[in-house]
């Protein structure tokens, strides 16, 4: 049977297409060999899936390479693809269907041809990045479906010992649908291997499934139930084993083919050789069953099968990539083993990855790892390392805590790094963090950075899953970093809190306010006790805080502002503020000052004029405290027109000067006057009188009821207040009294007199003491040009002992040089 099987494929392989199917199977092996040398040939072989090749002898395999190179160019894939019907006979693969039957599959390979041609392009790119593919299994590991991964591991051992499972695999088309997904996405070699494993019983229907529904099976690959998934996984495992043989060594592949044919003959399956070269994957999976007992190959096969399955699952989600390439698979398996070893050596990243995989994915992934490690030589050690992982975590946490404590002591704050920033960091920045951060923290970003490019090279769906893995890994890693960065922050805040607590040394027991300085607390307590310890030495105004007093001194008593000290006419006290002076006069001496004109001087047109002038001047002064020189000059010019009205607070008698009120207080109320009447010391000067007029008018404006005319008192003392003052003044001056009496008629006749119109001033007349023309002598009718001449005249002509004192008295009594004298004094 072996010879018959081998001879007819040789004869009919050249003429008939079924032998081409047989040759295509071996061509795949040789193709894997040439693939390493010249990968561009792969797409051509895929297009001519059923190349005419003969028995699995070594010589045929050697000749397959050139035949494959020449025939796919000239031969049409339609004829070869149709020869899969030969498997339905079940007797011999050499018996092929007529060319009429091949016309049907011709259309199907047309659909697959452009796809196969496009597939090898991405296939060549990943083998260039062999390192990336080696890194790939680390992250691809969790990507595989939870249910599919254990199924793969379980089915692979079952395939080898049990031959009866082989027909079951051939009979089911569902794995067949998943296989084409690998045909499109993985590569041309994988598709050829898948097609070679066509069913013995039904070859055409699986062909229709493979070619007709290439795209649909890609999607159901993931959601298929467990049973079809297992079958598909078994088919894939068979393919993986077959591909691994090709990748391991060419002679091994040849031996495997011979062994496969023998196994099939023993199983009484005459059509095994053509079926293997058919489009179904199931028969190919049976061949690795025999090879599984070999320990070295079994390791590679299991890893490759697992990866092919993961690639198949990924193919249902993502774009076509380097999935079934022989070189690539071998590199990925080696990379997977190496990467797992490295990961086991690295404690922190391994723990984080495994924990992330456990949390993000199903536990079957763990089962796959356990099964895989059992097949591998270092399984026990890896398990031990896995159990040691918690210890490593504890050690790492202890180191991290120590670092945190040291950082807290140093008071250094570190900024939190986002996971994206972490991925985007360059090697230079990583080196910087190596010097700063602990080593385990450095390892995780490197693994993440290595894993991310491999997934990007494979597929977009893989990228999404890698993002999930990275996200699952990053929280723990970031948690470590956040602990490192956030832990010093509380320490710094704690210190700042201490510094903040130290600042409020003093607390107010009333309102619980804190103050840094004791003096501030004392000033604050004055607000609760209404105590004003800071008083102005000039105006006696008190304040709670020293700052208020300094402000007051700058505003009211500063050097830049001209201050006029006010001297009290009764007690000789000095006041810097006019209002304080007025308050003193009112409270102590019972004297009220205002600008209301006396009733004796009331005239129809004078009252509004004088009041308007005084009010205007007062309003201007109130609006601005720092008045300009123009306003001062205006007030100085208008001060002569405004007359002060000084009232006695006891008897309501008004006087126009302080001298009159002094005499009134002295002779009527018996109050002693402490001040001396000296020239230049009286408040009748222009500056002082100006301020008096200003503030008195303001005070009168605020109290308009004071502007009403006083009621006429019946007492003779009040009605004749002014004449009595004059009389007392003249009587007080003994030296002047006699000359007045003697020379009264002369002076009365020479000086103009004006009688006061009204009942209040009967018998009063005015005498001019001085005017623009000169100074008049009250004792005689003589007029002198200067004041010195008048004083000399009084001294020599009228024998006056102190003419300056007499001038001061007359000047105080007079109002703008006008002296009012009664008729009695004149007599």
Swiss-Prot record:
List GO BP terms, alphabetically.
negative regulation of DNA-templated transcription
Annotated keywords: DNA-binding, Metal-binding, Nucleus, Repeat, Repressor, Transcription, Transcription regulation, Zinc, Zinc-finger
Q: Which SUPFAM superfamilies match?
A: beta-beta-alpha zinc fingers
Residues annotated as region Disordered?
A: 1-31, 117-173, 193-232, 682-723
Positions with biased composition (Polar residues) = 16-31, 150-159
**Where does it live in the cell?**
Nucleus
Q: Entry's PANTHER family?
A: ZINC FINGER PROTEIN, ZINC FINGER PROTEIN 438
Query: Protein name, please?
Result: Zinc finger protein 438
Q: Which organism is it from?
A: Pongo abelii (Sumatran orangutan)
Q: State the gene name recorded for this protein.
A: ZNF438
């Amino acid at each position: 049977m072996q010879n018959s099987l081998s001879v007819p494929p040789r004869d009919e392989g050249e003429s008939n297409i079924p032998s081409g199917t047989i040759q295509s199977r071996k061509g795949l092996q040789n193709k894997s060999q040439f693939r390493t040398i010249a990968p561009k040939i792969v797409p051509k072989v895929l297009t001519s899936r059923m190349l005419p090749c003969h028995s699995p002898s070594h010589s045929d395999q050697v000749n397959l390479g050139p035949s494959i190179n020449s025939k796919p160019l000239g031969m049409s894939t339609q004829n070869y693809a149709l020869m899969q019907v030969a498997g339905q006979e079940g007797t011999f693969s050499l018996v092929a269907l007529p060319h009429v039957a091949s016309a049907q599959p011709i259309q199907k390979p047309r659909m697959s041809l452009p796809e196969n041609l496009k597939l090898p392009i991405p296939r060549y790119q990943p083998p260039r990045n062999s390192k990336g593919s080696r890194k790939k299994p680390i992250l691809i590991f969790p990507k595989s479906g939870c249910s599919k991964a254990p199924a793969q591991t379980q089915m692979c051992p079952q395939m080898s010992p049990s031959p009866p499972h082989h027909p079951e695999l051939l009979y089911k088309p569902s794995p067949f649908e998943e296989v084409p997904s690998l045909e499109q996405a993985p590569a041309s070699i994988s598709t050829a291997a898948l097609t070679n494993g066509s069913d013995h019983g039904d070859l055409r229907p699986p062909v229709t499934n493979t070619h007709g529904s290439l795209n649909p099976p890609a999607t159901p690959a993931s959601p298929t139930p467990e049973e079809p998934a297992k079958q598909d996984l078994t088919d894939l495992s068979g393919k993986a084993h077959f591909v691994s043989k090709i990748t391991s060594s060419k002679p091994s592949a040849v031996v495997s083919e011979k062994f496969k044919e023998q196994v099939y003959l023993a199983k009484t399956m005459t059509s095994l050789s053509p079926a293997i070269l058919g489009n179904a994957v199931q028969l190919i999976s049976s061949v690795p069953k025999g090879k599984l007992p070999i320990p070295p190959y079994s390791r590679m096969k299991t890893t490759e099968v697992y990866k092919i399955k993961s690639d198949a699952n990924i193919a249902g989600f993502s774009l076509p990539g380097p999935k079934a390439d022989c070189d690539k698979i071998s590199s990925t398996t080696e990379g997977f083993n190496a990467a797992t070893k490295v990961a086991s050596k690295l404690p922190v990243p391994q723990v984080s990855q495994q924990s992330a995989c456990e949390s993000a994915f199903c536990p079957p992934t763990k089962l796959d790892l356990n099964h895989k490690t059992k097949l591998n030589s270092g399984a026990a050690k890896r398990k031990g390392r896995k159990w040691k992982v918690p210890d490593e975590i504890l050690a790492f946490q202890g180191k991290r805590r120590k670092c945190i404590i040291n950082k807290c002591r140093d008071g250094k704050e570190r900024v939190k790094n986002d996971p994206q920033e972490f991925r985007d960091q360059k090697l230079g920045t990583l080196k910087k963090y190596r010097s700063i951060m602990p080593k385990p923290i450095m390892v995780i970003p490197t693994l993440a950075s290595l894993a991310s490019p491999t997934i990007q090279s494979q597929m977009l769906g893989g990228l999404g899953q890698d993002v999930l893995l990275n996200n699952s890994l990053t929280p723990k890693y970031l948690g470590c970093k956040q602990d490192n960065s956030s832990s010093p922050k509380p320490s710094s805040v704690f210190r700042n809190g201490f510094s903040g607590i130290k600042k409020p040394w003093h607390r107010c027991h009333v309102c619980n306010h804190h103050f840094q300085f004791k003096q501030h607390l004392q000033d604050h307590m004055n607000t609760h006790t209404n105590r004003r310890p800071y008083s102005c030495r000039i105006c006696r105004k008190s304040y709670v805080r020293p700052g208020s007093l300094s402000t007051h001194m700058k505003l009211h008593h500063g050097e830049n502002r001209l201050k006029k000290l006010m001297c009290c006419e009764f007690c000789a006290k000095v006041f810097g503020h006019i209002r304080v002076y007025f308050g003193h006069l009112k409270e102590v001496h019972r004297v009220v000052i205002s600008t209301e004109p006396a009733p004796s001087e009331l005239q129809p047109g004078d009252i509004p004029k004088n009041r308007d002038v005084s009010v205007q001047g007062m309003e201007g002064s109130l609006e601005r405290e720092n008045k300009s020189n123009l306003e001062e000059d205006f007030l100085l010019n208008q001060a002569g027109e405004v007359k002060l009205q000084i009232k006695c607070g006891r008897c309501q008698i008004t006087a126009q000067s302080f001298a009159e009120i002094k005499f009134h207080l002295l002779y009527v109320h018996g109050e002693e006057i402490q001040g001396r009447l000296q020239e230049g010391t009286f408040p009748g000067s222009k500056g002082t009188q100006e301020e008096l007029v200003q503030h008195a008018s303001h005070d009168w404006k605020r109290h308009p009821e004071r502007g009403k005319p006083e009621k006429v008192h019946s007492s003779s003392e009040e009605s004749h207040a002014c004449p009595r003052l004059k009389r007392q003044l003249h009587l007080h001056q003994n030296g002047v009294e006699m000359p007045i009496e003697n020379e009264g008629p002369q002076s009365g006749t020479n000086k103009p007199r004006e009688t006061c119109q009204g009942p209040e001033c009967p018998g009063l007349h005015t005498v001019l003491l001085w005017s623009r023309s000169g100074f008049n002598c009250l004792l005689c009718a003589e007029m002198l040009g200067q004041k010195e001449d008048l004083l000399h005249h009084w001294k020599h002509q009228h024998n006056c002992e102190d003419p300056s004192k007499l001038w001061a008295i007359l000047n105080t009594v007079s109002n703008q040089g006008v002296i009012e004298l009664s008729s009695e004094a004149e007599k």
